[in-house]
């Protein structure tokens, strides 16, 4: 879950 802009270490991120 998340957006491409909010990618993290695992390639997933969250906006908020």
Swiss-Prot record:
NAD(+) binds at residues 14-15. One of its GO terms (molecular function) is glyceraldehyde-3-phosphate dehydrogenase (NAD+) (phosphorylating) activity. The keyword Cytoplasm applies. One of its GO terms (cellular component) is cytoplasm. Keywords: Cytoplasm, Glycolysis, NAD, Oxidoreductase. Its EC number is 1.2.1.12. This is Glyceraldehyde-3-phosphate dehydrogenase.
């Amino acid at each position: 879950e998340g957006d491409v802009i909010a990618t993290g270490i695992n390639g997933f991120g969250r906006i908020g």
